[in-house]
Regions:
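Conserved glycine-rich cofactor-binding loop
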Residues: 11-12
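Conserved glycine-rich Rossmann-like NAD(P)H-binding loop of the short-chain dehydrogenase/reductase
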Residues: 23-43
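Conserved NAD(P)H cofactor-binding loop of Rossmann-fold oxidoreductase domains
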Residues: 85-90
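Substrate-binding pocket helix/loop in short-chain dehydrogenase/reductase
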Residues: 93-103
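Active-site helix of classical SDR
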Residues: 117, 151
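Residue(s) in the substrate-gating loop at a strand-loop-helix junction
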Residues: 135
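C-terminal helical subdomain
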Residues: 175, 196-233
Length: 255
């Protein structure tokens, strides 16, 4: 039985950083890299010295998830690590976002993540790990990013409760909640009229991933990198959410 790691959103951004650093935290025979863009996956495979198996799949489609499910049933690998890094957001007034994009966020950010967790768990043993990527937006409601923020709140809640359930089997679940991070995420998220005008700070994905792997090894439940991100996490616990939303709208000069 071969030991594998599975990672979605593997072709760029944090997903790529997580993939390239897998050997520093865990030993596996093969890495299953899942992303939409086949050319980027192939380039990643050629550039790295890792044993990568690529899958060009659109996780919005149920058929893509079924392909993974069928492959797991066929090969029955030992999954040492699952990283759900695929996801996207749209920053715009809700009524200006297409229904397709709004539902798409829920499908990729929540439904695909949940499906992959539930499909992978039967092939996991003691000391296996799941890393799910959420966001600091998970800590409070965020106008003009509301579907995205809500989808990440789901990831945080689902992951923390799943981690408690799986702790008896020795399977650890970590939720990573990044602040603004320098990735291609914004190429798709930001509308032409740029509703979000001010980014307090942009963190490097390398630092976010490094902190996440350290927190995984320490068996923490939530990983938040950076002073500002941690401050936001604390303030969102202490302050009324209506007040937090007002601060956000004032910062972005939104009504």
């Amino acid at each position: 039985m071969k030991n594998i790691a599975i990672i979605t959103g593997a072709s760029s951004g944090m997903g790529k950083e997580f993939l390239l650093n897998i050997p520093s935290v865990i030993k596996v025979d093969e890495i299953w890299a899942i992303a939409r863009e086949k050319s980027l996956l192939e380039s990643l495979k050629e550039e790295s010295n890792l044993n990568i198996r690529t899958f060009s799949l659109d996780l919005e489609k149920e058929s893509s998830l079924m392909k993974i499910k069928d492959l797991l049933e066929e090969e029955k690998p030992n999954i040492k690590l699952l990283i759900n890094a695929a996801g996207f957001g749209k920053f715009e007034k809700s009524t200006n976002i297409s229904l397709e994009d709004s539902i798409g966020m829920i499908k990729v950010n929540d439904m695909a993540l949940t499906s992959l967790c539930l499909m992978a768990i039967p092939y996991m043993k003691k000391n296996s790990n799941i890393i799910n990527i959420a966001s600091v937006a998970a800590f409070q409601p965020v106008p003009y990013i509301n579907v995205y923020a809500a989808s990440k709140a789901y990831v945080l809640s689902f992951s923390r409760s799943l981690g408690r359930e799986l702790s008896k089997e020795g399977i650890h679940v970590l939720t990573v909640c990044p602040f603004w991070t320098k990735t291609k995420f914004f190429n798709r998220a930001v509308a032409k009229n740029k509703v979000i005008k001010k980014y307090v700070v942009m963190y490097d994905p390398t630092d976010v991933v490094k902190k996440a792997y350290i927190d995984m090894q320490k068996e923490k439940n939530v990983s938040v990198y950076g002073f500002i991100a941690n401050a936001q996490k604390v303030l969102c616990k202490l302050l009324p959410h209506n007040f937090v939303m007002s601060i956000w709208c004032k910062q972005q000069k939104l009504k």
